[in-house]
Amino acid sequence: MNQILPNSFRSGPDERGHFGIFGGRFVAETLMPLILELEKAYAEAKDDPAFRTEMDGYLKHYVGRPSPLYFAERLTEHFGGAKIYFKREDLNHTGAHKVNNVLGQIMLARRMGKQRIIAETGAGMHGVATATMCAKFGLQCVVYMGAVDVERQQPNVLRMKALGAEVRPVTSGANTLKDAMNEALRDWVTNVHDTFYCIGTVAGPHPYPMMVRDFQEVIGQEVREQILETEGRLPDSLIACIGGGSNAMGLFHPFLDDAGVVIYGVEAAGHGLSKLHAASIAGGKPGVLHGNRTYLLMDDDGQIQEAHSISAGLDYPGIGPEHAWLHDVGRVNFLSATDAEALDAFKLCCRLEGIIPALEPAHALAKVADLAPILPKDHLMVLNMSGRGDKDLASVAEHLGGKF
């Protein structure tokens, strides 16, 4: 907090992809020409009104945007404090926020003449979104997925295969998201001529954190319009779960310069912060992974430690570099929720709202359960319901001993 605060929290990154000391592009020499080619192509697409018009058309007619801003009336009554709204990204085509970003990247890949798309996935939602868009546009799709995640996210594995994607289980490391990303990067280095790497979160080398944020920003832009229309003012607080952090960044970014809006990011505390967890801000330190500098779970020798979360989409040992910077300058408050707290919130949402949340946003909902009761009734809180929980039912049932 001894940093000089910027005039705007929305002006980053700089031309080399840095948010303060975070971000950048730490990649193999063979990848640098691709990174620079991607940066140039994205800058050109961003300035092309036809690209934006085409994307907006697909977002409306294919993805189903805008997604609703829903007043969670029974949860609000249950907690007895803040008025709670859900941004219903779970209602998008493919069932999560991931498709917003994938659409943009696949359109960019086509513009660049790439015919083969690779992606990493944890919970499977980014993989499903990538497989979906590749099917729509007739592109080859290969998805890397940790073997552990393949087992606990079988419904999404079947969806990807049904959509024509090749799912490659990864059996190195902890067999989860970090390892899938490692394999995808190896593939990209080997197949630079025809392959586009579609990263699913606001991590990776520049320009990915910026690009994914820009494609996800539609979430917060819609919330801004919807809450002004519904309540006549901006929300008092925003809350979202954070693994890499794309759903959170999509919600947060349009509000970063609104000083009156308090922002909460919720990491996965797993079995507890003194045990196995995936809370990079709470339990990590700055280091370099997957092409960018950010907060990472590392040992004293700088080796990456394995992350754990009941949620396959949150068990990543790092966090997006812009989130790391927003933490350091004090603009976003980072909290964490354990597996047990997320399961309790999952059950509560099912029973009170008739909405089965993904385990990822259930972590954010767990902190709503802590915050909402102590806030006044006129406090407007918006939670990003980033995905639906069909994919998690078998996993939840197993953890609850089959008793919901």
UniProtKB/Swiss-Prot annotation:
**Reactions that this protein is recorded to catalyse:** (1S,2R)-1-C-(indol-3-yl)glycerol 3-phosphate + L-serine = D-glyceraldehyde 3-phosphate + L-tryptophan + H2O
Question: Is Transmembrane tagged as a keyword?
Answer: no
Q: What EC number(s) has UniProt assigned to this enzyme?
A: 4.2.1.20
Q: State the Gene Ontology terms under molecular function.
A: tryptophan synthase activity
Q: Which UniProt keywords apply?
A: Amino-acid biosynthesis, Aromatic amino acid biosynthesis, Lyase, Pyridoxal phosphate, Tryptophan biosynthesis
Q: Which residues carry this modification: N6-(pyridoxal phosphate)lysine?
A: 98
Superkingdom of origin organism: Bacteria
Which pathway, metabolic or otherwise, does it act in? Amino-acid biosynthesis; L-tryptophan biosynthesis; L-tryptophan from chorismate: step 5/5
Keyword Protein biosynthesis attached: no
Report one GO cellular component.
cytoplasm
Entry cofactors: pyridoxal 5'-phosphate
Matching entries from PANTHER family are given as: TRYPTOPHAN SYNTHASE (PTHR48077:SF3), TRYPTOPHAN SYNTHASE-RELATED (PTHR48077)
Q: Which family does it belong to?
A: Belongs to the TrpB family.
Q: What does the UniProt function comment say about this protein?
A: The beta subunit is responsible for the synthesis of L-tryptophan from indole and L-serine.
Which HAMAP family would you find in this protein's record?
Trp_synth_beta
Q: How does it assemble?
A: Tetramer of two alpha and two beta chains.
Concerning NCBIfam families, the annotation shows:
trpB
Any idea what this protein is called?
Tryptophan synthase beta chain
Species annotation: Rhodopseudomonas palustris (strain BisB5)
